[in-house]
Amino acid sequence: MKRRLFLVMLIGLFPCIVFAGHLYAAERTYNVLFIQSYNHRTPWNDRLTEGVRDGLSRGGIKAKVTTGYLDADYWTFASECVIMRRICERARQKNTDIIITSSDEAFYTLMHCGDSLPYKLPVVISGIKY
């Protein structure tokens, strides 16, 4: 009898919990860090950033997207790691909720720069070539 009552209560409360979670998510503005492998002058970077913003908006997610540029064509890997650690430090200061990387260089450098941030936040990868 107690088990049946528990199941009825659980089934009855589950939609309320899920619905409350959706309300909370809709009200919150998420801080998103979008790391691009190249510099801001690369022709497609603006479209990538716009695509991230549009996709989140269409999904009903309010987000403030901050873009960081690694400029991987210019720097050596050691210098990229220094830049990535700075990007991670700024992300910490802005209370970033999620990191999105675009292309191999951004993801690889993020995971190997020595900063702990990518191991504490969800990381979404896109545009992996190799």
Residue ranges and their predicted role:
Residues 2-10, 18-130:
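Short hydrophobic alpha-helices and adjacent helix-cap/hinge residues
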